[in-house]
C-alpha cells in the first residue's frame, strides 16, 4: 500500500491498498485529518474481486481501476486525477492483467504488479505476455532514466527502483528481444505445476 497526500489541501490518495492494511490507513488518514480523494488499483484479480472491492468502497472514495466493474470509476490513458493541488497521470499498461494501470506522479510511477524489481513476471504467467512486453518497453522504459518505479511486490526486500536500473539490468527485459522474452515466459511453470512440485509448507508466489 502506498499513500500520497497534499498536506496543505488535506487530501490524500492510496494506491493498491491491501485489506489487512485498511485499519492502519484509515487511522493514518484520521490522525492527519486527510480526506481520501481516490483509491487507485493498478490491477485486480477476479478471485479477489467481490471481497476486496466491498472493503475498498467502504473507505468512502471512488475506486479507480482499469477493469470496468459496478461500483468503480473507469479512467482513460492520460487522464489526470486531482489530489489537492497535485495530480496523478493515468498510464494504461496492460499485460500483467488485461486492464492493468500505472499512475505517474512527478518523477515516480506506481506500476503495481506490472514490474517486479529484478524478478520474473508474477502470477507466474502474465495475462498477456506480448502486451506486458510492450507496456514495459514502450510505456515505462521510455520515461526519463531517473524516474522511480514503485512495484506492488517486494523482491529481496526491494520494491523501488529506477527506469535506468531496470532497463539495464532486469533479467527478463534488459538486452532481450521480444521473441526471446515471449519464449521465456511461455516456459514458466503454471500455478498448478508449481503447486505440484513445491514442498509442503511453501507458498506459491501470487500477484
Predicted regions and their residues:
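Active-site His/Glu-centered metal-binding helix of metallohydrolases
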Residues: 45, 49, 98, 115, ...
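Glycine-rich, phosphate-binding/catalytic loops in enzymes
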Residues: 31-32, 57-58, 127-128, 166-169
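Short loop/helix-cap segments at secondary-structure boundaries that form the rim of catalytic
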Residues: 56, 68-73
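Active-site metal-binding motif and surrounding structural segment of the metallo-beta-lactamase
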Residues: 19-65
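Conserved beta-strand edge residues that scaffold enzyme active sites
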Residues: 43, 69-70, 154
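Catalytic core of the metallo-beta-lactamase
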Residues: 1-36, 71-151
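Accessory terminal helices/loops
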Residues: 131-207
Amino acid at each position: 500500500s502506498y499513500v500520497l497526500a497534499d498536506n496543505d489541501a488535506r487530501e490524500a490518495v492510496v494506491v493498491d491498498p491491501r485489506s489487512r492494511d485498511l485499519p492502519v490507513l484509515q487511522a493514518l488518514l484520521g490522525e492527519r485529518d486527510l480526506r481520501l480523494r481516490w483509491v487507485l488499483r493498478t490491477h485486480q484479480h477476479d478471485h479477489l474481486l467481490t471481497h476486496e472491492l466491498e472493503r475498498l468502497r467502504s473507505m468512502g472514495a471512488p475506486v479507480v481501476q482499469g477493469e470496468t466493474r459496478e461500483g468503480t470509476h473507469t479512467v482513460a490513458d492520460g487522464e489526470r486525477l486531482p489530489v489537492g493541488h497535485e495530480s496523478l497521470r493515468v498510464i494504461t499498461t496492460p499485460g500483467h492483467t488485461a486492464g492493468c494501470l500505472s499512475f505517474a506522479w512527478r518523477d515516480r510511477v506506481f506500476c503495481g504488479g506490472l514490474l517486479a524489481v529484478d524478478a520474473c513476471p508474477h502470477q507466474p504467467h502474465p495475462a498477456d505476455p506480448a502486451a506486458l512486453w510492450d507496456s514495459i518497453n514502450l510505456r515505462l522504459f521510455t520515461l526519463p532514466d531517473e524516474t522511480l518505479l514503485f512495484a506492488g511486490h517486494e523482491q529481496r526486500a526491494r520494491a523501488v527502483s529506477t527506469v535506468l536500473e531496470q532497463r539495464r539490468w532486469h533479467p527478463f527485459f534488459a538486452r532481450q528481444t521480444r521473441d526471446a522474452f515471449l519464449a521465456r515466459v511461455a516456459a514458466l511453470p503454471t500455478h498448478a505445476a508449481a503447486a505440484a512440485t513445491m514442498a509442503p509448507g511453501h507458498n506459491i508466489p501470487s500477484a
